[in-house]
Amino acid sequence: MSGMPNAELVREQQQPGDPMGSSAHPNAYVPEVGGLGSELPEAPRDKFFRKMREQPLVPIGSLLTCGALIAASNHLRSGNRDQFNKALRWRVGFQGLTVLAALVGSFYYGQQAAATIPAPASSSADAPLQQGAVTTLPGRAPTVWQQTRADERANKGRNEFEGRVGQALDRELNDDKRLEEALLGKEEEINLEQLKKTATKPRPVIGQDARRQV
């Protein structure tokens, strides 16, 4: 009779999808958390150079886009409308290539990182751990519930990354649009000033000599 409460407690503490129960091993998920925390975070400088090596077209496209904007502003100051419009078209082309390169690179390296998840050291005791990215006790395969939770975390991280990339691209497009509108507004102001100057000049009357007027 004294063992009945313990048996009921064992059944209550069993997790969904775990037929063997986890009350005998309350720290079954500690290796997974420890494995994630043992990885040192990448330094910002190393991450910057790694991104430069992985996606060289993105910084090159950004520099070309900035160069086209600078050229457009110079042509606007000089009053060359044709070259100004041409520089704006180059800016749009460079920006489109930069966005396309960023999206393709993010998708490619995201798939590559997901396919190359580091697996634990293989041995005869923990061979079942190679079935997925979920770490369990040695000799035990991951349960359906554990695998489902791991897939949910992976999908959530991927969706958050794609959302951040989309927000960054939207901010860049909005900034470029505002800059282009500002440049076009400045060009219209210059044209209005030129029209005002030409309108204020006195026009000579045909057949009338201004020198004879008193």
Swiss-Prot record:
Major localization listed first in the record, in broad terms: mitochondrion
Coiled coil: 177-197
Keywords from the named record: Coiled coil, Membrane, Mitochondrion, Transmembrane, Transmembrane helix
Top-level taxon in the UniProt lineage: Eukaryota
Disulphide connectivity of cysteines: none
Region (Disordered): 1-36, 195-214
InterPro entries for this protein: Hypoxia_induced_domain, RCF1
Occurrences of domain HIG1 (ranges): 29-120
Membrane topology: Multi-pass membrane protein
GO annotation, biological process: mitochondrial respirasome assembly
Subcellular localization, as worded in the UniProt entry: Mitochondrion membrane
Membrane spanning stretches: 57-73, 88-109
Record's function text: Cytochrome c oxidase subunit which plays a role in assembly of respiratory supercomplexes.
Family membership: Belongs to the RCF1 family.
Subunit structure, interactors included: Associates with the respiratory chain complex III/complex IV supercomplex.
Name this polypeptide is given: Respiratory supercomplex factor 1, mitochondrial
